[in-house]
Amino acid sequence: MLFPLVRASSSKGGIVLADLRYALRQLLRAPGFSATAILTLALGIGANTAIFTLIDSILLYPLPFPQQERLVRIGYGGAQTETAFFPKGWIRAVGDHSSSFAAVSGFGPDTESNVGEAGAPARIFGAEVMTNALDTLAIHPAAGRFFTPEDGIAGHDPVVVLSYGYWQEHFATSPAAIGQTIRIDGVSRRIAGVLPPGVRFPYADTRFLIPVTFKGGDAVDPWLQFNLRAFGRLRDGVTPGLAQAELRGLQKPLLALFPWRMPDIWASEMTVEPLLESQVGSLRPRLLLLFAAVGLILLIACANVANLTLARAAGREREMAIRGALGASTRRLVRQLLSESATLGILAGAVGLFTAAASVRALTRWLPADTPRVQEVSLHWPVIVFAAGASLLAGFLFGLIPALHMARPKLGQALHAGSRSVAGKVGQFRVSMALVVGQIALSVLVITGAGLLLHSLWRLSQVDPGFRANRVVTAEVSLDASACQAKGHCHAFFQTLLERLHGMAGADQWALADSVPLTAQAGSYVYDAEGHPRDARQGALLATARTVTPGYFATLGLTVVRGRLLQDMDLSGATRAVVINQRMAQRLWPNQDPLGRQILHVSDEPQPAVWVPAAALTVVGVVNNTHENGLAGDFADEVYLPLTPAREQPVLYALLRTRTGAQAAAEELRNAVAGLDPHVPVTRVRTLNEVVAASVSAPRSLAVLLLIIGALALAIGGVGVYSLIAYIVSWRTREIGIRLALGAQKRQIVQAVVRQSLMLALGGSAAGLIAAAFAGQLLRRFLFDVRTLDPLTYTLVALLMTLLALLAAWIPARRAASVDPIKTLRME
């Protein structure tokens, strides 16, 4: 029994190889058709593979940590854990009280520091982490050691852990680097260890880590550093849901540990989600939307190539009829034709893979720099498998209908010399028309989505940010963090810099601030307000806080609604003045005069809800609302605090309303800073218009990518319409010649061709717009101030498809009108 099976198997294998060899010969005999089909399919396969590469690398590829599924992020208030911040004391308390976590830790924001000798420091990103952070990740150092609990005690020998990339670039991966010192923000730190290769923690651009420190014996210190993100490793068998339920049960006891009252958001429910999801969850809907769009591109490409294959079938009907007459079964013919389609698909897949690789490189450079895991994007083996699968699927999709059509030819008709009559092609034309209508419908679906996103982006760009961005330049001026240890030094430096800015020839207005609008850098202000109930059992109030010099309001063009702005006399701190925005005034004291009212930071209360008039700030003015956390968001309560000696800090932003242009003003600023201290770097120089543009980078990148995909869909769909109309005109040349000979006008011939093209476009557009009306609900979360059934977008898409149909019909219509009836009849 074995030998017959082997013979049968080898026989089948031989047939498959023979089919493939024959398929290659057929494709080589039609190089024009083959090249067109391969390129069309390669566009669809390449686009799908490129987006799948992003999905695989960003959403699916595991983090480089052992048992990464047990790593979670902790948040509160139902908000994304990415925006939840905790004090180090709370994180430590969770680790002590919770039984769900094997370890709980935290890390600070991604901040730039002066790294190197005082004469030539470089600005490099680093982060503070709690000493158990790297052990929580369960990773091992590439060299040296990680932090120990002693490293987290204030006054202990300062240490640093380097990223593998920094170690490689600056120390050539030499083990001798361990124990050496580097200067970070004026502090000499001993290199304790190096992260393993491939680990980017906690941010993609982090180059070094320093430990969060605790002051022993200070009961308040653990609650002051309120900028840590919390994460943990779950115990075996514990799910994020179980950990979340436990944290919600512990929420009130943990909240009671704070030395002051917290805002109401802290009384809302805690959240626990996988670490990977916390990093990329916000990106998932956008990537899936793009994947759906490029999936439609592949369907459009398959329909286009199916039509090309049907057109080519006209020249092969005689061949198929003869093979059928010689005994080839329909199944055998279908298999042969599908072999040709599969070969085309595989060749297109190979080209598409190269196209995808180039597209991925371009995408990773073009996407916003803060896109999660964008530096990790590469072609892993699942991408190769996906490309191969997409190639075979494409070959099946575009090859099946032509194969079924070609495998059942009518022998008499195929061998008849006059078989070019339209009557013999009615069935083929109907199939081709259906495919073209489908192409147009899918193209309309994609371009409508792109149109809605573009309209939304335009509406977003029309939002008034609340300040005048034109001609304003911002720049970061960075002293060493250790400079403020000498009380008053940082404040004196920036006060002197402010005086020098007054003499700048290139600026009309100037100011210093601790943050720039629309960058989400502003701090939080937790307070009680005069006239509002104060109860130790209730949450405190919360506002966004910005520390500024008096010129800030004029530089940004903010409008005084009531009272006055901050003045130079407020910089000493004696007046205890504060300016608030309209929203805060209306929310706290509706229909009342806010001037003279007082607010008190909770840290200035000796006991929760105990008012101390001498420590309170007095509202001296109200200004218009400005957007802080994005143009699409609602206004938040804002307080503007004067830059007093008590609020000194090592890093401030200079804001200049320029006369001479951004570059000239920035150079003047650098000279002014260098005149005070040539070693202080001036970085992040950009215009406020660039800041505003960066704030909408995510919706802009999505809209532009979908527009590119939509343009590709239109191009393929337009070619499909043109090819079909041209093919029909070619087959109806005899009929057109006879009609012209019988007196038909050329105008009538042109109208008939254009009418047919418009009917195809009308049918496809109607189907596409109906589909878009239903699919538009999926876009709702991406739209700003635009309805999913936006009449402007739908009208423009309909007009665009009409124009496309006219353009696609123009050349075939002219060709039809130029038919010579005499030559046509003579050929008959």
Language model: regions and residue ranges:
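Mid-to-C-terminal secondary-structure elements
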Residues: M1-S9, E112, G126-P149, P158-L288, ...
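Membrane-helix entry/capping segments
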Residues: L2-A35, F65-P66, G77, E112, ...
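Alpha-helical transmembrane segments of integral membrane proteins
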Residues: S11-S34, L275-V280, L308-R335, S339, ...
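Short, strongly hydrophobic transmembrane alpha-helices
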Residues: P31-I58, P62, I300-A303, G345-G349, ...
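Alpha-helical transmembrane segments
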Residues: L43-R70, L310, S359-A369, L442-R471, ...
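Small-residue-rich transmembrane alpha-helices
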Residues: I51-T53, A306, S341-A414, L452-H455, ...
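Membrane-proximal extracellular/periplasmic loop immediately following the first transmembrane helix
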Residues: L63-E112, Q225-F231, E273, L460, ...
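Interfacial "coupling" helices/loops that link adjacent transmembrane helices in transporter permeases
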Residues: A301-G345, A423, V719-A761, S765, ...
